[in-house]
Amino acid sequence: MSEKQQILDYIETNKYSYIEISHRIHERPELGNEEIFASRTLIDRLKEHDFEIETEIAGHATGFIATYDSGLDGPAIGFLAEYDALPGLGHACGHNIIGTASVLGAIGLKQVIDQIGGKVVVLGCPAEEGGENGSAKASYVK
């Protein structure tokens, strides 16, 4: 089976559990830098799949970087996971979906990375809508 098919099979087989994660995050909207539930939920799923987790990234208590390294030469392929909500609007921005889909994509790719080499990285991006410490996205590139 091709690597692409292995990834697609993982996604198809597991998509409903990720939809459930997205719904749970949607039901508990958290503003920028307050995304305790959302970041913990995404981190827990990544840990279940052997990703190494760094937390409190770039001055953001709810930021994280999750890495799965095959140990083989190859590219680092990154996914940006946003998960903050809008004041008074909740997840009208869809970040519950964006964050969860990024984790699903990363874990899907992890299914073949030991065969093809490289590493998979998820940048957990709190406060994408801004906030007192600014967007984590901007902090990552400083």
Mark where each language-model region is:
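Acidic/His- and Gly-rich active-site-bordering loop/insert found
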Residues: 3-121
